[in-house]
């Protein structure tokens, strides 16, 4: 959505996103989660035009200067370079609905000090490390040295049981959101284990209200950090290792914004 908006603004085009119906789940929950105040009825629908694909993950400046009108964008577009010039509009759209924002904000403000967060993406990548490597605990330990020792730290994860079993995360500074609901449908992880995926809205809202971040190689925590709007220091894993050995053909050099800190890691 953000990159679509950025490209449309650069080309002075109208734009559309799919509406919610029985085939399209509310555009991945955008309207369920965010205010989306810049989306008008005329922005909902489909374009009967050519497909224009981004295949390699890197920033392609020609999208901002040459993208033809009446096009459907396909790809990840996972870099803020497509929408950095309209970042204020994206932040406005991605304002959380009050039902999420108010209780999360109340909780954050109840803490003695502004927290940071770290994101452990674990369970859905087990057995798939050749595509999505799992960051070791040592990576988070090294990153936390960039923050004062008494800074509270939320641990957001898709594997709460594993994190809480690790001695490292038993330190008093770590906080967990343990009341996360799950989707009704189930997905399968790399080891064939079926599970109900966690609902993301509350965790993402809490991430956005923190004052610093240690993200995983994940677009979820990438957005959690970006939505902080430069409120604190953001540390990211080396983008060259964002994906595993089976995906070395992808150019990930533009995923991490220049103002964020990059940390190396190894198993």
Place the predicted regions along the sequence by residue:
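Residues within alpha-helical segments
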Residues: 1, 5, 9, 99-106, ...
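N-terminal pre-catalytic "stem/leader" segment of glycosyltransferase-like enzymes
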Residues: 1-20, 24
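Amphipathic alpha-helical segments that form well-ordered structural scaffolds
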Residues: 3-7, 139-146, 162, 206
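Surface-exposed helix-capping loop/turn segments at secondary-structure junctions
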Residues: 11-16, 147-153
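Short beta-strand segments
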Residues: 17-19, 119-121, 154-157, 236
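Secretory-pathway luminal glycosyltransferase catalytic domains
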Residues: 22-151
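Donor-binding and catalytic core of enzymes assembling or modifying cell-surface/extracellular glycoconjugates
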Residues: 148-250
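Leloir-type glycosyltransferase catalytic cores
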Residues: 243-267
